[in-house]
Amino acid sequence: MPDLALEFEIGGIVCGIDEVGRGPLAGPVVAAAVILDPARLPKTLLERLDDSKKLSKRNREELAELVPATAILGFGEASVEEIDRINILQATFLAMRRAYDALGRECAHALVDGNRPPGLPCPVRCVVGGDGISLSIAAASVVAKVRRDAMMADLARAHPEFGWERNAGYGTAEHLDALKRLGPTPHHRRSFAPVAQYMLF
């Protein structure tokens, strides 16, 4: 389970940053930056926060409602157009920088999930598997996941055939079948091979 050991080791104001949505065929990539206040963290968050991929949808949503009361949050996203123009890695870094900027605070350090730094105005420590190690990164992973899932559910209302409210834009059989039958929507990443093969022009 993640804890605050890295945050305490570094000291000062530390934010955790994570993203969701690098792999999907549709929708934006979304990042969150979170500064936790250790003195105000409820036991519920300390005991239940984990890598968002290990939590049920219900647990993620419950935790995402609790985090803002004891944290400073910043969100950033990179659009489908930006993903197609600058590639998914650079778009991920862009979303992370936007999330950091949205905090409105200068941090002594940022803990970033992954092995490549996004280029921030403060020192960065990359933590592979960070959402299972750092509580700040875990919080960022949960709130980013819940936010992006809600965005994809909204987009699904206009394009119900793709099942985005269930698959969040990932290349499930349902999604790929609809893509083959109907072709890409404006929300698809045209630079991704499974989408590009169904483009008419």
UniProtKB/Swiss-Prot annotation:
Domain RNase H type-2 residue range list: 12-201
Entry's Gene Ontology BP terms: DNA replication, removal of RNA primer; mismatch repair
Gene Ontology CC: cytoplasm; ribonuclease H2 complex
GO molecular function: manganese ion binding; RNA binding; RNA-DNA hybrid ribonuclease activity
EC code(s) of this entry: 3.1.26.4
Subcellular localization, as worded in the UniProt entry: Cytoplasm
Broad enzyme group: hydrolase
Cofactor(s) needed by this chain: Mn(2+); Mg(2+)
UniProt cross-references to InterPro entries, sorted A to Z: RNase_HII, RNase_HII/HIII, RNase_HII/HIII_dom, RNaseH-like_sf, RNaseH_sf
Record-listed a divalent metal cation binding positions: D18, E19, D113
Cofactor binding description: Manganese or magnesium. Binds 1 divalent metal ion per monomer in the absence of substrate. May bind a second metal ion after substrate binding.
Pfam families named among the record's database cross-references: RNase_HII (PF01351)
Catalytic activity: Endonucleolytic cleavage to 5'-phosphomonoester
SUPFAM superfamilies linked: Ribonuclease H-like (SSF53098)
Keywords: Cytoplasm, Endonuclease, Hydrolase, Manganese, Metal-binding, Nuclease
Family statement: Belongs to the RNase HII family.
Function of the molecule: Endonuclease that specifically degrades the RNA of RNA-DNA hybrids.
PANTHER family: RIBONUCLEASE H2 SUBUNIT A (PTHR10954), RIBONUCLEASE HII (PTHR10954:SF18)
Protein name according to UniProt: Ribonuclease HII
